[in-house]
């Protein structure tokens, strides 16, 4: 437990609760016409209501202060019907036994109507299934061309197979991935590069209603206990056998660790050896960086590479996490959301096998110090080619202001703009009022729901309404969006690394990934911001697929969405829709 968290949780809370080489001929894709660009200041505008989204998370809280109540829930972005428009899945929890409300609460699948609005199709899709859901991860695990859904829960997790006709079937038991316990985040990735997606699921603590402990703030009322009150619970690794079933290989892979209390997880290739590694954010226990040993096993190198503890050697309360090349070095760095008074962590990968803690030098420490950050991720909201940072914040104790007035339960999100030279600036107040509205933030994801080229935001709130924030005027710069289709690799190219090179020689690295954030997942297509508009701008890209194959494409026009098939080059291209100031 960190000193800062001890001050809050113990002194103040009185021990309470709380990727074969191949080089196809150069391809331009579709010629990109001149765009009538939006102009003006970038604003993230709340369009939730007009988009037809009415999801509200149900924590099931009724006064008993069960710890899972304050942990949910996540959101996932997917194109479940392959129409080229991103859809949304919100994870929901439920009422506790014996305290059932008037209506059932389910996850919510919203179909993109292609006009700025969404329709709730949960029941028609076969997803109206109650569970105490916390997180989700989506991917085409059976390589049939349709994205499937995995939901983490307190209890039995659920795997819903996409039938390809707008409906899903619960195949949890048949697949063997129920994984009972207190699960939070999940990652679909191909750790053995066999072309089939495997599944990693984080577990938090050994908790059940029967094991619930009494913690109090004032010796009168029950409060949420801290994770130190409970034992940890090992995360799980499932190997995809290729026949629709999975095998639990956690112990064989060297990942069994019942001391960890894991919440967020990110897939990355931190050493650029072509094999997927895993980073796991732990709450009040050392973070783990599992290096892939190329033989079906992993080794924890978190301590030796410098990401297990803070710069001062303390454990933190890690929640969400993401990996990305924010300094354009060609190496993936790590971003972690932590507890109040710990600030966010930013570990820069220096390419030598070590990470450097740059939370202070980057400028993110001061502005994130009082925030309790759950979801966090890298994304390029202004398309200047540099990865920015988003953080969703919210405390875990609904009465924290009673014991520490300077802290609030509902907290505003934070948007950090990457100004170059490894520096960030807080621009939350410069992009409109929506991000300044305090919410009990938990999950978050980015997506281009309106296909205008820039990235919009989804934020969930604990026991509150979800929000869709449209990025307005964010597409004033040139860009390229890339979707991958694997052949030897998994169908969606998850784990593929794409390096874009501009005519000026700038190199941008992005990876197709699942998971990251907190209990959530952003869209799979990659977005490359290309900076100021230039007529006839072209770029080249190199793709390193999980199979090891390399595809090189040159003279690709900017301002389009291209689909690249492994070994075949560009198989589809369309111009990016013209951005507008209003939907």
Question: What is each model feature region?
Answer:
Residues 72-82, 111, 132-146, 158-161, ...:
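Beta-propeller blade termini
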Residues 43, 61, 364-366, 406-414, ...:
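Gly/Ser/Thr/Pro-enriched helix-cap/hinge segments flanking short amphipathic alpha-helices
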Residues 44-46, 117-126, 167-177, 244-255, ...:
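Blade-edge beta-strand/turn elements of extracellular beta-propeller
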Residues 85-92, 144-153, 199-203, 277-282, ...:
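Hydrophobic beta-strand segments that make up the repeating blades of beta-propeller
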Residues 1-16:
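N-terminal secretory signal peptides and thylakoid transit peptides that target proteins
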Residues 53-74, 125-137, 176-187, 231, ...:
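Repeat-based blade/solenoid architectures
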Residues 91-104, 205-230, 392-408:
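Short, conserved, GDST-rich strand-edge loop motifs in beta-rich repeat architectures
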Residues 108-112, 234-240, 291, 348, ...:
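Beta-propeller blade signature
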């Amino acid at each position: 437990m960190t000193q800062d968290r001890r001050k809050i949780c113990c002194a103040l809370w009185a021990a309470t609760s709380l990727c074969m080489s191949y080089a196809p001929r150069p391809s331009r894709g579709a010629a990109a016409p001149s765009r009538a660009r939006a102009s003006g200041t970038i604003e993230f505008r709340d369009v939730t209501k007009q988009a037809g989204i009415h999801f509200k998370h149900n924590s099931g809280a009724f006064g008993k202060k069960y710890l899972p109540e304050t942990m949910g829930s996540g959101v996932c972005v997917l194109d479940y019907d392959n129409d080229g428009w991103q859809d949304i899945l919100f994870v929901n929890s439920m009422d506790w036994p014996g305290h059932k409300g008037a209506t059932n609460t389910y996850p919510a699948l919203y179909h993109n109507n292609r006009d700025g609005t969404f329709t709730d199709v949960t029941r028609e899709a076969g997803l109206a299934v109650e569970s105490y859901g916390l997180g989700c991860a989506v991917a085409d695990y059976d390589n049939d061309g349709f994205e499937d859904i995995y939901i983490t829960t307190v209890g039995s997790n659920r795997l819903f197979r996409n039938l390809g006709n707008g409906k899903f079937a619960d195949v949890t038991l048949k697949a063997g991935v129920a994984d009972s316990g207190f699960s939070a985040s999940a990652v679909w990735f191909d750790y053995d590069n066999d072309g089939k997606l495997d599944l990693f699921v984080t577990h938090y603590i050994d908790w059940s209603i029967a094991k619930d402990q009494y913690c109090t703030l004032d010796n009168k009322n029950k409060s949420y206990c801290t994770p130190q009150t409970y034992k940890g619970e090992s995360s799980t690794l499932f190997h995809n056998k290729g026949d629709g079933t999975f095998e639990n290989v956690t112990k064989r892979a060297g990942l069994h660790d019942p001391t960890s209390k894991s919440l967020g997880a990110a897939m990355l290739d931190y050493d650029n050896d072509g094999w997927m590694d895993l980073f796991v954010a732990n709450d009040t226990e050392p973070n783990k960086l599992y290096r892939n040993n190329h033989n079906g096993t992993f080794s924890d190198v978190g301590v030796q590479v410098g990401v297990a503890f803070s710069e001062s050697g303390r454990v933190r309360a890690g929640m969400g996490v993401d990996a990305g090349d924010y300094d354009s070095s060609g190496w993936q760095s790590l971003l972690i959301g932590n507890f109040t008074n710990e600030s966010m962590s930013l570990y820069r990968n220096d390419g030598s096998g070590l990470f450097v803690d740059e939370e202070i030098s980057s400028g993110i420490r001061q502005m994130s110090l009082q925030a309790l950050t759950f979801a966090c991720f890298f994304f390029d909201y202004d398309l200047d080619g540099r990865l920015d940072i988003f953080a969703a914040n919210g405390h875990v104790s609904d009465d924290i202001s009673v014991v520490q007035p300077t802290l609030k339960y509902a907290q505003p999100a934070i948007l950090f703009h990457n100004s170059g030279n490894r520096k960030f600036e807080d621009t939350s107040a410069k992009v409109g009022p929506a991000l300044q509205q305090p919410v009990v933030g938990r999950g978050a994801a980015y997506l281009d729901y309106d296909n205008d080229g820039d990235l919009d935001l989804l934020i969930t709130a604990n026991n509150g309404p979800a929000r869709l924030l449209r990025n307005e005027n964010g597409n004033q710069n040139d860009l390229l969006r890339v979707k991958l289709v694997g052949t030897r690799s998994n169908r969606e190219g998850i784990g593929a690394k794409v390096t874009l090179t501009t005519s000026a020689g700038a190199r941008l690295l992005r990876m197709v990934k699942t998971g990251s954030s907190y209990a959530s997942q952003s869209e799979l297509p990659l977005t490359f911001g290309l900076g100021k508009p230039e007529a006839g701008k072209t770029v080249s890209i190199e793709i390193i697929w999980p199979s090891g194959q390399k595809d090189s494409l040159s003279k690709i026009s900017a301002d389009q969405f291209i689909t690249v098939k492994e070994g075949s080059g560009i198989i589809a291209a369309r111009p990016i829709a013209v951005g507008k100031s209003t939907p």
